[in-house]
Every structure is written in C-alpha cells, then in structure tokens.
Amino acid sequence: MGTQKVTVSLIFALSIATIGSFQFGYNTGVINAPETIIKDFLNYTLEEKSENLPTEVLLTSLWSLSVAIFSVGGMIGSFSVGLFVNRFGRRNSMLMVNLLAVAGGCLMGFCKIAQSVEMLILGRLIIGLFCGLCTGFVPMYIGEISPTALRGAFGTLNQLGIVIGILVAQIFGLKVIMGTEELWPLLLGFTIIPAVLQSAALPFCPESPRFLLINRKEEENAKEILQRLWGTQDVSQDIQEMKDESARMAQEKQVTVLELFRSRSYRQPIIISIMLQLSQQLSGINAVFYYSTGIFKDAGVEEPIYATIGAGVVNTIFTVVSLFLVERAGRRTLHMIGLGGMAVCSILMTISLLLKDNYNWMSFVCIGAILVFVAFFEIGPGPIPWFIVAELFSQGPRPAAMAVAGCSNWTSNFLVGLLFPSAAFYLGAYVFIIFTGFLIVFLVFTFFKVPETRGRTFEEITRAFEGQGQDANRAEKGPIVEMNSMQPVKETATV
C-alpha cells in the first residue's frame, strides 16, 4: 500500500460534510438563549388569537413542546438513515436533505411575521428530522473516505462541527447580536445559510468509494476517487478489501434492524454501539449545557451566559485536542479516561453546589468542575461514539447500525431533557450523583467489552467479531477485545 496523504480534495470533502454536524450543534443550542423572548411571543400570539390570556400551564407546555419536538424529529430522522444512503448514496443523501433544513428554517424564520405558533413547532420538528439524518450521514461518509490510519482523527471532525455549532448558537443568541425581540426569528432561521452553502459545494465532493464499489460495482470510479483523495496511486490493497467485502455481502441477505439483534455476528457490536451512544447522553453533558446558565447562576456567577459560552469554548478546544490524541492513544483508552474524569468532576459539582452557601470559594470549584467535566467529555464520550459505530460494521449492516445507534442517542437525549428538570427539582445538588452512577457503569462496560479499532481495516474488525481469523489475531496482535490501544498502526499517512 502506498503512503496515504492528506490532500486538498480530502480536506474539502471532510469540511463540507461537517457542515451537517454544525447544523446539528447549532439547532441544539439555538433555542436556549431566547427562551424568555419566545415565551413572550407564544403568550402574545395565543392572546391575539383567542382574546383570552393563556394559562401558565399552556405556555409551559407549548415551550416544552417547541424544545422537545426537535428530538422527536431527530429520532425519526436517525432511524431513516438507511432508506437514503442505500438508495441514493452518502453524498447525494446529504445534498437532498438540505431541502428539509431550508423548509424548517423558513418556517421558524417567518413564524413571528405570520403570528403562528404552529409554524415554529413544525419548523423545529422538520429541522430535527434533518439533524437526525445528518447524525447518520456525516460520520458514515467521513469514515468511508478517510485513510485507515487517520480514520479516528477525521472521525472527530463530526464532533468538532457539533460543538462549533453549539458555540456559534450561544454567541449569536447574545442580546447584542440576535437574541432580541426583533431578531430571534433570524436566529432560528440562520440554519438556511449553511444548508445553501453545503448544497452548492457538495456536487464538487466525491461519492463514498466504498458505496460506489460495494453497492454499485463501479470499481474504476472508486479507484480513481481513492487515488485523488489519498494522494497515492497504489490503492490496490484497499480496493481488494472492498471487493472481498462485496463478495461476502453478495452471499448474505440484506441486513435489517432486527437482523442486527438476531445474528451473533452483529449482536455484540450493536450492543456496544448502543451503550456508547448512551454513555454520551447519560453522562450528564446535556444536563450541564441545557441548564448551564442556571447552574452558573446558582454558583454565584453574575453574568452566567458568558460563563456558559466559556464552557462552549472549552468544549471546542478539547475536541481539537481529541483529534490529535485519538490515533495515538486509541479510542478505547480515551473513552475510559473521559468517563473516569467526568465521574470525578460530577462528584465535585455535587459537593460544591451543596457547600457554596457556606463557603464562597466553592462557587469557583463548581465552575472549575464544570469546565473540566466538559473537557473530559470531549476527550472521549463526545467524539468517539459517533465514528466508532461506523468502524464496528461492514458495508452491509452499517446503515442499519447507524440508524439504531442514532435513534438511541436521540431518544436518550430527549429523555434527559424531559426528566432532568424534575430530577433537579426533587434532588437538588444530588442530581449529578445519578450521572456519576451511569458514568461508572459505562466505564466498566468499556473496559470489558469495547474493542480497540485504531489502525484496523473494516474487514479486520468485522472478522474479529465473526470469530474468523482469531488464531492470526492472537499471533499478530491479540483478540480484538483485548487489543492494546497503544500498539503501533500498520498504515502510514502524511500531510
């Protein structure tokens, strides 16, 4: 195999694909800052239509629906990933669904002019559907066009796009920018602009070479794309690996969601995929970001919104750090370090929130614990679950696996957003102990069950789960579940 390079074509394709991740992050964070202003809009609109003052219960219910409907759309979208990528390809699927982003953005952007609560809620549902699809398309596309030796580092770009989107939403939501009574519809409708930019650029990006060869049997086209993306003429080994995988697929029936759980070959990797997604959402990170302003306020910070933005900056910085670490330390090791660090920080958050009224300096301990909590999240549980799912499965079951994993992520996201306020009300500062328990469970699971995939081809990983070639694995590098994450990789890549 020739030396694989990081080419301009590869960076361009990765950057354009990551716009979908940015959209997910932006639309996740954009609804938080203008909460009071949007509630005033709901109140005024309902009063104008019914000529009666709406009850507090109705207003709260509509606000909660406006927030939660995004996750409902995400669940539906993530479960529909396979319907698109198997028929239209990875790139074309990303291109097509931008219509949803434009439609959702228009509905939200014009809801105030139309004085329509329904347009706001429908827009959030549609944009959630779009983001749910993106959470499947983007990591799948990135994983399939990246060189094996850099697949983990480039896989982290998906999470980097998400956290940059959240940070931009937080900044744009400031009152000095678009978080005002007049401009909040533009804040929500801004999602149209990245959708248009991505739509204009995607035709210049290549289709996934794995999709072209394995699904459409276009070997020459796939070979040409690999040579252009990786900057080497010698891609024969990669082409042969894809052809072998294609031959295996031809002997198997199409893999459905149910088949993932019925087949012994797929059962372990799909359980690992689901648990990794749950480890991301049940770690407490969304509880921290959804309610960070209130947490900082409780900790005694005078301008909590800026402290929340500070947490977003830390989020972004450590995602970049993870990008450089993931191919050196390995996925499994970083995930365990992240989970362990978050568990310690969640205990510190609980203690500092309990004692801040007695000791003023505990407020600073709380803020520090939150920032370090976010940093550990981006070292492991933030980026790794998204791209490792694509690594655990071959071409056939990958779309169904991405759908199940994505739906697990969105469902747990929805449940945390729904249940955390009540849990915080009844448990107070002790609420983060719940997340500590989850973090410890996921840490133990990762130690015993999650394989190290660094430097492994898709075929090697799949065969290890199928139980094939175990003798060779023991002789050369040990069983996959026991792989040392610090082993040197075989492939090389240069910039």
From Swiss-Prot:
Facilitative glucose transporter. Can also mediate the uptake of various other monosaccharides across the cell membrane. Mediates the uptake of glucose, 2-deoxyglucose, galactose, mannose, xylose and fucose, and probably also dehydroascorbate. Does not mediate fructose transport. Required for mesendoderm differentiation. Gene3D superfamilies: MFS general substrate transporter like domains. Belongs to the major facilitator superfamily. Sugar transporter (TC 2.A.1.1) family. Glucose transporter subfamily. The modification Phosphoserine is found at residue 485. It comes from the Eukaryota. It holds the Pfam family Sugar_tr. Its main location: membrane. The keyword Iron does not apply. GO terms for biological process: D-glucose import; D-glucose transmembrane transport; dehydroascorbic acid transport; galactose transmembrane transport. SUPFAM superfamilies: MFS general substrate transporter. This is Solute carrier family 2, facilitated glucose transporter member 3. It is a multi-pass membrane protein.
